[in-house]
Amino acid sequence: ADIEAHGPSELFYSDNNWDNKAARWNEPIANNPEFCESILDRIRRCVIRDKNRASVVIWSMGNESAYGVTFEEALAWVKSYDSSRLTHYESAQYTDGKRKYDYSNLDLYSRMYPSISEMAEYIDGDGDKPYILCEYCHAMGNGPGDLEDYFQFFDSHETTCGGFVWEWCDHAIYR
């Protein structure tokens, strides 16, 4: 589903330095029960609309909106409605540490633009889900210069699933 909430903290908090934003990112929407019905409605509509499309192999909960009760409920609904497909949500890592979060309905651990060392830390540590890059190698300028490093890492670790290159296009100004 196209649930995206880049920076709602700007509207809610006077102290918007990065540490404060990161620590409280999930409070305004993702971990706010008042948004459960809205998030669930959007997820339901997407899944019901696209359930018969053969190209859909993974349900994504959205992009960069943090994690909390709204997405826990949405994931539970998705799994009850369509258990045949995998689920992922890149923003599941963005929580506030104030409670124990439910990740049981997530099948994949997904990230955007991690370093190779960050990936290795998850895989060699306590990571309990296959690792997938839901966005990497943004093709802007010389951004994709790390493709070979990622490919070698994918090939040498059985619990990686590869990834999805974000925007395989050139954003340079045409002259």
Where are these regions (language model features)?
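Substrate-binding/catalytic cleft of secreted carbohydrate-active enzymes
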Residues: A1-R175
